Amino acid sequence: MGIGNPYIENGLSLYTAVASTHVIKTTGNKGFIASVIVGTAGVTAPSLTLQNSAGTIFAVIDTSAVRAVELNLKFTDGINAVNAGTTPAKVTITYV
């Protein structure tokens, strides 16, 4: 993935492909990630992790159901959604 503009506007979604890393950057490389909603109903990707650019894992998410994960962390260089699962997963970013 990673084709096109890597910046994601507030409230928009992207789909992470199987065995891929997608770099998500807030506009202007700053802002707090308020929540990340991962998964779609009936879709599983049990190995989806959210990491910073150094590979530090902030969340491991079971996407067997749609759920919100409150991170409340500041990402100055974006966040990586790493999908090591067997199906795509949807990631929705909301930040303030």
Predicted regions and their residues:
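Core-facing hydrophobic residues within beta-strands of well-ordered domains
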Residues: 31-33, 45
